[in-house]
Amino acid sequence: MDMGDHIKAIETYFQAIKVRPSHPDAYKNMGFVFKLVRFTEPNSNLKEIISSILDQKTIIKPIDISRAAISLLKFDPDIKKLLEKSLACEINESFESIVSDLSRNPLLLKLMSICAIPDPQLEVAFRDIRYSLIKSVNKIKSYPDLLHFQSALALHCFTNEYVYYQNDKETSLIKLLENVIEDTLSKGEQPKPFLVLCLASFKALYPYKWSDLLEITPAINDVVTRQIIEPKQENQLKSDLATLQKITNQISSKVRDQYEDNPYPRWINTGLSLKPTSFSEINKNLKLRLIDKRIFENKTPNILIAGCGTGQQSIYVASIFKNAKILAVDL
């Protein structure tokens, strides 16, 4: 199937969605096609469709359609301007107006909030904006559009494990910012949301001893949920997970600690099957050549996922197989 066929398929599914907006199969199939497509011209309707797919949370992995979304977003005049200024090293001169423009791009902010964005140009631009923000903490006046963008940026950096390069100047500024927030909270006062979001774009908030003292306001609600509440819930859930045996091997312990500190891939939403099916139905769809047919007699399969990582595969498999018991194992 060439690119023209992909575009025709998308147009067909788009028409189906217009007739029946709640058509899950059309969204699912369109999501599969988006994985294969890079757009060469703007299309505002498709931006809305991608946004709708992301809103449904379980249609497809956000990262799988992020490249298609980015190829559409790059036709947006504000994003074109962002990339031009980033290339010319001019973001610092006008970053406030750039941020205001970007804050009004719902698809961009949605992508930033739920997945890594695999695009080197945008990565450099986001890194430059982040640096400009922390350099301006004592000068900038916060406003709703700025906080909206900052929240998306902090969520994005948390999801990508703070992979962006951090220079020595930023490290010093982060230390100052940490002290300001801690001192403010120690006085029984609340730090400005701008400062909290600025720090959250460089470091996760949950390890800080003062994290529980933050009042959850609309401006920082999403970031506090993702960076404080959910990690603490995860730690509580650890005690409920069954352990086969205690790990004594030093290397295995180090690998486990590494993945627990920086779970990869960190994910927010994932794609699931629309409905579970039996082995025989799956075999029919995949056209597998199985010699031993006895597997089709098993109506309640026990399935082992060895090396389940951060759980996406285990959850997906559980959504595929009808009446299955899943045992997911890892360090």
Residue ranges and their predicted role:
Residues 1-303, 313-320:
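Alpha-helical solenoid repeat scaffolds of the TPR/TPR-like class and their adjacent stem/linker regions
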Residues 304-306, 324:
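Helical anchoring/docking segments at protein termini
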Residues 307-311:
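Class I SAM-dependent methyltransferase "Motif I" SAM/SAH-binding loop
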Residues 325-330:
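Conserved SAM-binding motif I beta-strand of class I
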